[in-house]
A protein has these predicted regions:
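N-terminal beta1-alpha1 ligand-phosphate binding loop
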Residues: 2-26
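Residues at alpha-helix caps and immediate loop-helix transition turns in enzyme cores, especially N-
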Residues: 18, 67, 100, 130-133
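Hydrophobic residues within alpha-helices
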Residues: 18-26, 104, 137, 141
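Short helix-loop-beta junction
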Residues: 20-32, 109-112
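Generic structural signal for residues in well-ordered beta-strands
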Residues: 34-36
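Helix-loop-strand module that forms the ligand-binding subsite of alpha/beta enzymes
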Residues: 39-117
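Glycine-rich phosphate/pyrophosphate-binding loop and the adjoining helix
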Residues: 43, 115-154
Length: 154
């Protein structure tokens, strides 16, 4: 069984709705379980112990939420321990910009995580299309975590 961590921040519930759709996708994959956690309650041990991770944030001033950036700052010391884990990003916001998503994807790259799929950007209230895309994102991430867990380690 692989565990996929879904770390998110949501003030209005929009990003949380996307996170719940990702959880639904993860749990639709046999052999995968999801752990949904607000980033302000997450620890670096949550990051270390998972097999894959999804990061979700609102778009604040064309960037991820400060509490998400704070989590990455705290996790810097364990970067080598999480390198290679499959990951994805998703964002919500009032604008049409994908800059918050790009900021999360830069962190994914900086931590040498594996980008398992392109992220999802939702504008305003998540649409059914956004929720379907997030469910698919969760499925893809869970399948990649399972594939990676089956690769023999040297």
């Amino acid at each position: 069984m692989v565990e996929v961590l879904v770390l998110y921040y949501s003030r209005t519930g929009r990003t949380e709705a996307l996170a719940n759709a990702i959880v639904e996708g993860i749990e639709s994959v046999e052999g995968a379980s999801a752990k949904l956690k607000r980033v302000d309650y997450a620890t670096v041990n949550d990051f270390i112990s998972c097999d894959a991770v999804a990061f979700g944030s609102p778009n604040y001033f064309s960037y991820m939420a400060g509490v998400m950036k704070d989590f990455f700052d705290k996790a810097l010391s364990i970067r080598e321990r999480v390198a290679g884990k499959p990951s994805v990003a998703f964002t919500s916001g009032g604008g049409s910009s994908n800059s918050a998503l790009l900021s999360l994807e830069r962190m994914i790259s900086s931590f040498r995580l594996e980008k398992a799929a392109d992220g999802v950007v939702s504008q305003r209230e998540p649409s059914e299309e956004n929720l379907r895309a997030c469910k698919k994102l969760g499925e893809t991430l869970a399948k990649r975590a399972l594939e990676r867990s089956e690769v023999p380690k040297d």
